[in-house]
Amino acid sequence: MADWDEIKRLAADFQKAQLSTGLQRLSERNCIEIVRLLIEKGLIDVIYTNDGKEYLTQDHLKQEVKDELYVRGGRVNLIELARVLNVDFGKIEYTAKRLVEKDPNLHLLLGQLIETSYLQRLASEINQKLVQYGEIHIGQLTTTYDLPTDFILNKIVLANLHKVIFAKQDPTNAHIFFTQSYIARNKAKIRGALAAITKPTPISVILNLTDVPARILYMSLNEMSSLGSVTVQSPAGQYIPHVYQRMQAQWVKDYFKQNGHIMYETVTKLGVSDVRSFVQAQLPDEKLVQLKNCIIGNRLIDQVKDSMDMCVTSNSYLDISTILPSSLSDDNIEEILTHILTPTIRKQTYVFGMVVLTVNFMDECVKGCLELVNEHAKRAVESGSYQKYIAEKSIKHQEVDHGVMEEEKADKREERRKKASTGKGGGGAQGRETKTKSTKKHARGTRGNVSDSDDGGEIQTNASNKKGGKDPHIELITAKEIAKVVEKTLEPEGLEMLAKDVANHYFPILSKQALVKAHELYEQSLQKNNQNRRQTHASIQEKLNTLYNDIRLYEKGLKLFPADVQGQLLKYLLKTFGTDACNELCLYVASECNLNTNFNAPLTTEQRTKIANDSGPEYRPHLQTLCKALSASETVEDFLDKTEKTMQACSMMLKKIDKKKDRNLILCHKHGLLEQLTNCTDPALVLHLAVLIIFTISTQTMLHASGRHVSAILTFLQTVLSTDDSKVFNNYHDLVLKLLSTESSTTEEAKANAEDITKQLGELTPVVKNIAGNFKKAGVTPVE
C-alpha cells in the first residue's frame, strides 16, 4: 500500500511539474524515460494505446469498457470497443473476461459483451412481438438479434417465461412459442372452414384459404375428427368431410336401385379410390357381378337370360343393346354375354358384336347360297380351273412323296455310316480315330402343308418346305358373294350390317361344299369325257388321214416343177395343210394332258411350242419334232414321216394308200375348182383357178399353190396350151398385174387406167373360163 501511495505522490509531483512554468517542466523525452524506468522496476503497471502516445491503467480501462457498455445500451462488440478506445484487442478481450468473471450480470458471447439489462429489454421486445403476431420462432429471433439460438432460448425466453414473456411453448417444436389467444383464434378459423367444406379438399387449399400454420391445422383436425378425416397429414393429403361420405353412400345406393348397375368411372369421380370394396360395402344384400369397368346387379343378368331363352326357343335373334342400359359399352356387353352363355346355349347361337343369332336363323339366311355354290362349282369344272387345281395338287403330292422317300434314304445311309464308324472290334481303321459326319437332323418346318379337299387333312413335310411353294388353292365362292345373298335376308330385320360377319362365318363351310360339289361334277364329266374322247379320237384320226392324203397328192404336183419353184410350193404346202395337221395333233395332246387350250384358232408357233413342251413324256419328243418340221423339212416325205410317228404316239392309225381312191380324189378336186371358177368374178382369182384346173387336167395331179405362184404355173403350162390360148392367158395375166398395181394409186390417171383394164379383163374373163372349162389333155378321154 505504501508503494502505491508513493506512486500517487510521484504522479502528483509529475503532474505538478507538467503544469509548472517552462523552467520547472520536464521534457517529453524525460517523461518517457521516467515512465520506462518505473515500469522496469515494477513500480507501475500501465497499458499503451495503439499509437503509443498515451498510457492507461487496468482500472481505468475497465472503467472505460463499462462506460462504453452503458453508452451502447448494454451490448458492445469487442472489436468496435478496441477501435474506439485505441487499445489492443487482446487487452480489451482480457479486460472483458475479467469483468465477466467478477460480474454475473455480464455475458461474453461471440466477441460481444452483453449486460443483463439488455437481455431484459430483449425479453420485453419478444413479448411485444408475441402480443402482435401471436407466434414466434427462435430462428426468427436469431436472425433479428444476431445471437445464438440456444442463448436466446435458454437465457432470454425460457429465463423470462411467465415473467416478462407470457407465452406457451409448442410441445412438438421447442423453438416455437405462441399465445393462447392465437391458438384459440386459429382453431376458430379451422372449425369454421371444416364445417363449410362438403367435398374432399386438399390440405394445401385449406392452408391457403385459412392462412393457418399446418401444425396447428393438424393438431385441430385431430380434435375435430367428428367433422371429417384426413388421408395423409401433409399438404398432399385430403380432408374428407363425413357429410360427403354419407352423400357418396346414398348416391351409390340410389343410382344402383334405379339403373341396376353402376360404372367404376362414375364412382371414381365421387372421390372413391377402391370402387369395388366401397360399392360392395354399400350394397351388402345385392348379388353383384364384377365386370371390367362396371358392376351389374343380378336383376339385369336375369333379364338378359330370360330374353336369351326366348330367342333360342323361337329360333330368331336378339339385340342385347336393346335390353341393357345405353351407358354400357360394347366390352361390357361382351362380358355379360360371356357370363350368361352356357355351353348349351353356345351350341345353339352365334354372337356378332351385340347381336345373338341362333343357328337355325343363320341357316335360313344362307339357304340362298346353296344355288350359288352349285353354280360356281359347275362353272369351275366347265372352265377347267378345278381340273388345274387337281393337277397341281397331284404334282404337290408327288413332290411330297419324293421328298419323304429321299429323306428315308438319307436316314438309312446315315445309319449305315454310323454303324460302320462304330462297328465291332477294332478292325478297319487300325485303331485310329475316324471322323464321321454329324447325323443330327434339322427340325422340320411347318410351312408347305398339303391339304386334301375331300377330308380336309394336312400333311407337313420337309420336302414341301424345300420347294418353298404354297399349297394349291382354289376359291370357288367368295365371302363377298355370300354377303350379298345374306344381306337380302337380313335387310327386312334391320340386320344388314351383320351380312359380312355371317358371310365370313359360313365362307369356309360353303367353300368346302363347293369343292365337294365340284368334285362330283368333275367325276361326272370324266365319265362323259371318256365317252366323248373315243368319238373325238376317231374324228381327229379321220381328219388327219384326209390331210395326210391331200399332202401326199399335192406332193406329186409340185415335183413337176423346177427345184427353185418346188421349194416355194413345199413351203406353202407345209404352211397350210401341214400346219392344219400339226394344229390338230397339238390340240389333241393338250386335251389329253389337261393343258390350257383357250387359244385363238389357228394356233401360233409359240402356242404349238408351249403345248409340245408342256405335254406328257410320251408325246413331247414326237410333237416337238413335228413342230420343228413345219419350217425345217426339205421334203414332203420327211414331214409326213414325222406326222405318222406323232399319230402313232397318239394311238392313231394311218390308213393304207388306195390308188383308185386317189383318182377319185383328183377328179373331185378338179370339179371343185371348176365350180369355184364358174361362180368367181374376181380377175385375179379367175386366173388362179383357171391355171390350177388346166394343170390338174394336163398332169392328172393336184397342185396347192398361192397367187404368187401363178406366173410359174403359166410358164409350166406353155407346153400344153395352144398358141392362141397361151397368148390369151399371158395377156390376161399382164392385165391382172397392171390392175393390181393401179389399185394402190389414187391419181385420176391411175383410176382411168384401172377402168380401162377392168373393161378389158371383163371381155377376156369368159374366154379364160371357157378355155379352162373345155380344156382336155391330149390323148385322154375325159372322165365324168
From Swiss-Prot:
Residues 398-472 are annotated as: Disordered. Residues 398-414 have a biased composition (Basic and acidic residues). Signal peptide: none annotated. One of its GO terms (biological process) is response to endoplasmic reticulum stress. One of its GO terms (molecular function) is UFM1 transferase activity. Disulfide bonds: none annotated. InterPro entries: Ufl1 (IPR018611), Ufl1-like_C (IPR056761), Ufl1_dom (IPR056580), Ufl1_N (IPR056579). GO terms for cellular component: endoplasmic reticulum membrane. Its EC number is 2.3.2.-. Keywords: Transferase, Ubl conjugation pathway. E3 UFM1-protein ligase that mediates ufmylation of target proteins. Belongs to the UFL1 family. This is E3 UFM1-protein ligase 1 homolog. It comes from Anopheles gambiae.
